[in-house]
From Swiss-Prot:
It catalyses: a lipid A disaccharide + ATP = a lipid IVA + ADP + H(+). Pathway: Glycolipid biosynthesis; lipid IV(A) biosynthesis; lipid IV(A) from (3R)-3-hydroxytetradecanoyl-[acyl-carrier-protein] and UDP-N-acetyl-alpha-D-glucosamine: step 6/6. Belongs to the LpxK family. ATP binds at residues 51-58. Its EC number is 2.7.1.130. This is Tetraacyldisaccharide 4'-kinase.
Length: 338
């Protein structure tokens, strides 16, 4: 879905008219969040966000996986598999499954990490354990109470923050902000904007680490784009951030097209992109997540298609590493005491 523009402006007449619906939605979500979850037997780290749409959870999840591997752990990612038809639990095979099977984000992550998809997170956790998981990393699921979380890491975009601060449909929030803040252990702010500073101050006041991070484009991909004019397209939570990343890296965008998050590209849309690129002498560039969704149909876009990979770089990585060690050790001590 495309996010309404009023979600990211000061409260308007429309958002005020929708506040009663937001109050009901918020009450239901808040009651659900306060249910007691099930212990999995291994530490569970959740990467989530406060609002609907993208914030950088997937690159954060992959960065967390790498940090855990550096600490000697065997992390397995657990995802609901949004956009996929398979309910799971299933271990994603990047060579066998498609985005239509398991969702675009799990398919993309499965190229570098073991990923389990399951609508029922308890079943997914059991499969992850059977795959030798020493730590489960939940990609999304902050508002889901199914599993006991040993740490919740919230990702927030520095330019968008929490929008107008209202609960869906009056705003982008999935649940009332105070409840979500109270359950946050770490906040990771992506980018150098200031829109998230107010909520970050609340986390810091509670003693939680607030870490700055940035998305670093893959140098090999950028080298392929050097000196070229491009047609950039993306169907992700925040296409504008992708376009801004390209421009900040010195890429000349001659044309850009934004699609809704998880957008299933049609043959006509792909043909239109290829035709526009050919007529303008442009190189097509998109995200890894979009490429996972396009799948074999990418051949219709030509050999010049570039999928820009990005990596999350955390400024105070040592601080995050210490936090992870502490929470993992606490979780294991708690499990041993039982």
């Amino acid at each position: 879905m495309r996010e309404p523009a009023f979600w990211h402006r000061p409260p308007s007449l429309l958002s005020r008219l929708l506040l009663p619906f937001g109050a009901v939605y918020g009450e239901v979500t808040a009651a659900r969040m306060q249910k007691v979850g099930i212990e999995t037997g291994v530490p569970v780290l959740c990467v989530g966000n406060y609002h609907l749409g993208g914030a950088g959870k997937t690159p954060t999840t992959l960065a967390l996986v790498q940090l855990l591997r550096d600490l000697g752990e065997h992390p397995v990612v657990l995802s609901r598999g949004y956009g996929g038809r398979l309910r799971g639990p299933i271990l994603v095979d990047a060579k066998r499954h498609s985005a239509a099977d398991v969702g675009d984000e799990p398919l993309m992550m499965a190229r570098t990490a073991p990923v389990v998809v399951a609508r029922e997170r308890t079943d997914g956790a059991a499969l992850a354990r059977s795959q030798g998981a020493s730590v489960i990393v939940m990609d999304d699921g902050f508002q889901n109470p199914a599993l006991v979380k040993d740490a919740s890491l919230i990702v927030i975009d520095s330019r968008r923050g929490v929008g107008n601060g209202c609960v869906f449909p009056a705003g982008p929030l999935r649940a009332p902000l105070p409840l979500q803040v109270a359950r946050t252990d770490v906040m990771i702010i992506v980018g150098d904007g200031q829109a998230a500073d107010a909520v970050a101050a609340q986390i810091a006041a509670r003693g939680g680490p607030v870490l700055r991070a940035r998305l670093a484009p893959d140098e090999t991909s950028l080298e392929r784009l050097k000196g070229r004019r491009v047609l950039a397209f993306a169907g992700i939570g925040d296409p504008a951030r992708f376009f801004a990343t390209l421009r900040a890296s010195g890429v000349e965008i001659a044309e850009q097209r934004a699609f809704p998050d998880h957008h299933p590209f049609t043959a006509d849309e792909l043909a239109s992109l290829a035709d526009s690129a050919r007529r303008g002498g442009l190189t097509l560039v998109t995200t890894e997540k979009d490429l996972a969704r396009i799948g074999p149909d990418a051949a219709s876009l030509g050999s010049d298609l570039v999928a820009l990979a990005v990596t999350l770089v955390v400024e105070e990585e040592a601080r995050l590493r210490r936090f992870l060690l502490e929470r993992i050790n606490q979780a294991r001590t708690k499990q041993f005491a039982r």
